[in-house]
Amino acid sequence: MILLFFVLLVIAVVCVIKYVGYMNSTYYKVTKKPFLAMRTDVGTYGEYCIFKLLKSYENKGAKFLFNVYLPKGEGETTEIDVLMICSQGIYVFESKNYSGWIFGNEKYKMWTQSLPQGKGRPAKKEKFLNPIMQNKLHIRCLNEYLKEEYPIYSVIAFSQRCELKKIELVSAVSYTHLRAHETR
């Protein structure tokens, strides 16, 4: 019984530390998203993981914005997941907190996420927008909005829960998995 109490106490302390850390983070201060919403929404959690990996840049003067909506014409908008502004330029992050296998070609509008369904069952396949094209649109809209030239860098961040199986690139684009210190 004492061991169970001790385990529950340790779990409670860890949860409180994570909660307080989140509530004091720039991510929370900017988005106002509740802690449980961040932990239960896969997309929001991916954005928060990007911020956690980059938050040390705040000490060097970097500023962060999240879920930035920009006009793209005809009354429509496009959303940047994470924007980091620093002395080197502006970094535009597209977060893909996916699992499974990822297949894509830089030239194709849609990419595929393949999720295994168990032995003997076909994989479930989901289509999603090409993140390279998405970020090109974000950067074009950001340039039009700013009306000045700034160095802008595109970063596509996939979670460590997925495997980039076949990604075909034609331009000088590099990719890597974003490694968070904590997994789901």
Range-by-range predicted roles:
Residues 1-30:
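N-terminal signal-anchor transmembrane alpha helix of single-pass membrane proteins
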Residues 32-49, 127:
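A short, highly charged nucleic-acid-interacting micro-segment common to nuclease
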Residues 55-75:
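A short acidic/basic microdomain associated with nuclease active sites
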Residues 70-71, 158-164:
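Short, internal active-site loops enriched in acidic
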Residues 78-85, 90:
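Short acidic loop-to-beta-strand element that houses the catalytic metal-binding Asp/Glu
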Residues 96-157:
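Catalytic cores of nucleic-acid endonucleases
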Residues 176-183:
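Conserved small/polar residues in nucleotide/adenosyl-binding loops
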